[in-house]
Amino acid sequence: MKKFTLLTLLLTILLVLYSVNVNAQQTIKVGILDTYSGPPAVYGNDALNGFKLALNDINKKGVLKTKIEFTTRDDKFKVDIGLSMAKELVMMEKVDLIVGTINSAVSLAVSDYVKGEKVPFIVWISKTEKITGEKGHRYVFSTAENTYMAGKAGGVALSKKPYIKYWIAGDDYEYGHAIADAAWRNLKALKPKVELIGQSWWKVGEPDLIPYITAITSAKPDAVIFATGGASMTNALKAIKSTGMSEKIPIWIHTATDHAVLKPLGAEAPQGVMGTMDYHFYYPDTPANKAFVKAFQDAYGNPPGFPAFHAYITAHLIAKSFAKAGAIDKEKFINAMEGMKVDSPVGEVEMRACDHQAVLPLFLGVTKKVPKYDFIISTDIVTLPGKDIMPTCEEIKKARGGS
């Protein structure tokens, strides 16, 4: 009898331990691969805070009777390191999906890797249109606007201006060329008589852009399309301001109205630069955006930037998709994510099924100093709905080699 009781006790303990272990394994695990060192870290950390803010609410209720947890890896803005970290997240950490990435080249490399591993990957900052365009596949998604969308927005805006002779200048890497190609392609389609009279390309992070600006100004174009971002954006805006370029030549730069760039620049930021942006903490002036900004400000002491916005909606898409899937299963998760809709600070966002690209708006404005703020902001904002600036599903099919 004692042996039977002891055996029963041991079996009970084993069952409890097994149950605890199974429950532990069933936690939804997200691997965040982003840049947390060097100048781009400001974007990586902002995104991380947006993701954490969303998880704080999501995990109060839970998803599938469990919680979403995450682990981070720093890609150091380098392709080889990013790819190595992605492999570590998949093979060592056993994550259910990967999110993140700023560097477009890193995003493309990781996308190619996860395709073979059949692990979902959601890009939330990287903007190359190849991610959900010609290089897109079942396992990759994007909650960021991409270069096609930004380029079309810029093309639409510039096509309504009287400018004919253009100069293109920017960062000599994937993002720079992608945004330039998209802007010019769309502008040329809408206004065939425009001419490209010259181009200037510099290495990413080039500290002195004044020689380039001086040469461009001397060429006397009617307008300039800048294809730059990150640290180069700061240097470009400084050079534009110090040379007075924006007072002489109209300029369009995607993300020129980014608060993360304009606020630190202060008086060094130029006025009169046209820019498109995917998120502003001060626009739209709606209850949903105000609530998001207040929650973020209370938690982290500063307003959210565009990375926080994208990471925030990414978290909610993940939660709703797993809930719809009904299980922690990668294939079911992907099926559920396709066509998923979530409310966001800028309105409803849909994950389009045909290309796994989030449908969200862009905001076109002009840099200007206003009395309400002690830094330059975007003014005269026009909202461009996502559906109006995205490629059609038929175009995506053709880009991927479909008939």
Regions found by a protein language model. Name each.
Residues Y18-A24:
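Sec/Tat signal peptide C-region and signal peptidase I cleavage site
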Residues S84, E129-T132, H137-T243, Y282-A291:
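Extracellular/periplasmic Venus flytrap/periplasmic-binding protein
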Residues L237-Y312, F322-I328, T367, P371, ...:
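Extracellular/periplasmic periplasmic-binding protein-like sensory domains
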Residues G31-K52, R73-D80, I102-N103, A169-H177, ...:
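Extracytoplasmic "Venus flytrap"
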Residues Y43-L64, A182-A189:
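Short, polar/charged alpha-helical segment
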Residues V42-A47, K61-G133, T143, W201-L209, ...:
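Beta-alpha junction/loop-to-helix N-cap segments that form part of ligand/metal-binding clefts
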Residues T8-Y18:
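Bacterial N-terminal signal peptides
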Residues L89-I102, I122-W124, W167-G170, K220-G230, ...:
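Periplasmic-binding protein-like
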